[in-house]
Structures are given as C-alpha cells and as structure tokens.
Amino acid sequence: MSNLFKDMLKDSESLFKNPIALDYDYQPKLIPYRDNEQHYIASCIKPLLQDRNGKNLFIFGKPGIGKTVATKHVLQDLEENEGEIQQIYINCWKKDTPYKVVLEICEQVGYKWTQQKKTDELFQKAKEILNKTSTIFVLDEVDKLQDTSIIYSIVEDIYKKTILLITNEKDWINTIDNRLISRLIPEFLEFKPYNQEETKGILKQRVQYAFNQNVFEEKAFNQIAEKTFELQDIRTGLFLLKESALIAENKSLKKIKLEYSEEAIKKLATFTPKDKKHLQEDEKQILALIKDNSGKSIKDLYGIYSLNNNLAYRTFQKKIKQLETAKQITLKDHKDGWGYYKTVELGNLKTLKDY
C-alpha cells in the first residue's frame, strides 16, 4: 500500500538546516568568484603589515554583488592571521554624520567616556588610541555620509592606515572636495556583476548551507537562478530561496516545486533589499508620508512634510534620493507647460507582469 504522507513534513521536520545562511549579512566560509578583488583589497592593506602607511581604495559596483561580503572576508582573514591591526567598520547608512561616525569609532576602540563631548574632542581621544597601532577603516555605503569632513580628519590625523570606501555610486567620488581627493589618492576597484554561471554557483552554495539535502526541485532552483541573474542582485536570489521554501513549508511539503518559486517571484513586487529598520526616524516619517500620498510631486510632498517638520527643501530632496537608492520608493519624470518635475511612488513600480 502506498504511503500518501511520505512527501509531507512532520511537526519536528523542516526544510531549513541553517536559515541564517540566507541573510544578506551572512559571511560564508568561501567567497566564490571574487578572488581577484579580495587579493586587490589585501594588497592595499599589505603595507600596514610592514609598519608602513597603507593604500586607500575606492570600491564601487551595483548593489548585491559582493562588495561588502568580500571586504569583510579579507578583514576576517587578516584578523585570524594578523590580529594586531585595528579594524574599524562603519555603515554610513546608519552612521551618517561625523559625530555618529566618531562615536562608533570610540565604541570600537573601547573608549567609553563619550558623554557630553563634542566631535573634535571624541576624535582626539580616538586618535590617541589609533595612532598606537595600524588601522583599517571601512566606510561602507560611504555615499550616505552627510559630511565628508570625517574622512579628511582620518586622512590627516591617523598615521598608519588604509581607508576602504565602499559605494554603489561610481560617480560619488566626483562629488567630494578636490582637497580631500588629493590627500586620499585612492586606487579604484570595480566589482562587476556576476555572470549567469557565477550567479547559479553562489545560490547553489547558499542552498547547501541553508537547506537539508535535495529539497529543491531542479526547475524551481533554475528559475530562481535565472531571475536573480536577470535582476543582477544576489540579495534577490536569497529572498526567493527563502520565500519559496517558506511557501512549501506552509503546505507541509518536503520538496520546493516550480509553482512555489513562481509564487515567490510574484512577491518581488513588494520586496526591498534594504530593511526599513535601517532607516532614520525622519526617513521613516517621509516614507510614511509617501505611503499616504503616493504619486505626488517632491515639491507637494515637501509642502505637506514642512507643516509639522523643520527640514530644508534641499535636505528633503536628499532624503528622497536616499530612499530611492534603497529601493523603498520610485521616482518618475514628468513634463508639463512649466517644465520638468518628479513624482514619488512607494516601492518598486514593477507589476506582476514584469516577472
């Protein structure tokens, strides 16, 4: 007699072995297809091992193609083999002012007496600690900094260092002061998108880390790999792997079928790689305003926002641009009798037909 329940999950069973392996910040033991980039990053750090000043590096490329994870892998390798070099990692999306950056540096070097001290005072204390050794500074999402003076301070006042600037925005380097560029003298490293074979290989590696054996039907996995390559963002693929597995688990099934990957792809219309918890309070307020007024122009939105908030129009425009970069909103260009203007809509404008 056939077992009608052999393909059903029991209460204690799960498709997942290690779901953390599908998180965007997860650090795999091996970073495939980025050996050349990691060696280049390491070469900029190498002079620090010889008690000399390191090279500064501007790292750029599209979102979700391994810039941060490859950099962190190099730092992890350095920590395991050369633990005497101080490492400072700052995400400038979260720490976007000189004060916030310096406060984070103080925390990472173990200086705790930060209350009622100004930015310059805090940096002076951090400098005294950092100049006793060599330091690697990683400023991730550096384009989110509201003020680049902190980079200038690091360049001028920290003796032996390597500064790694990471951004999705290739042209950001052209927006900073020439005086800073002349002191940074950065080298440039572009992370190019993964090709189709590499994309499939990365997702296959994550499947091995995250799931029990043989849970994905080949057609379902291939469809996810194809969609990920099309969108050129590995984070999208991780979302699809996780979502399709959750759909199968909700049905108590042991196999992830093509229909579940298709259902997961439909959910991409509401998916944003940048979690809203990373937004600042004013950005959350602006996002809530857009939700209630989707389709209005930036000028009209500012008119509503400024009724209860004190924020310059130029700063408001910058916040709108940051939300667009984070894929929380979409800007659309329009033209009327008075010229060009932009309207703002919530989330990703792609419809299910686009998928």
Indicate residue ranges for each PLM-predicted region:
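AAA+ ATPase "lid" subdomain C-terminal helix
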Residues: 229-234, 242-256, 291-292, 309, ...
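Conserved C-terminal helix/linker of AAA+ ATPases
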Residues: 247-272
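Terminal-proximal interaction/regulatory segments of ATP-powered molecular machines
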Residues: 296-355
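Conserved catalytic segments around the Walker B and adjacent sensor/switch elements
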Residues: 56-58, 80-94, 187
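Short amphipathic alpha-helical interface segments
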Residues: 280-303
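Walker A/P-loop nucleotide-binding motif
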Residues: 51-73
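Mid-core helix/loop region of P-loop NTP-binding domains shared across ATPases and GTPases
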Residues: 9-16, 21-23, 71, 75, ...
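A short, basic N-terminal segment
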Residues: 1-54
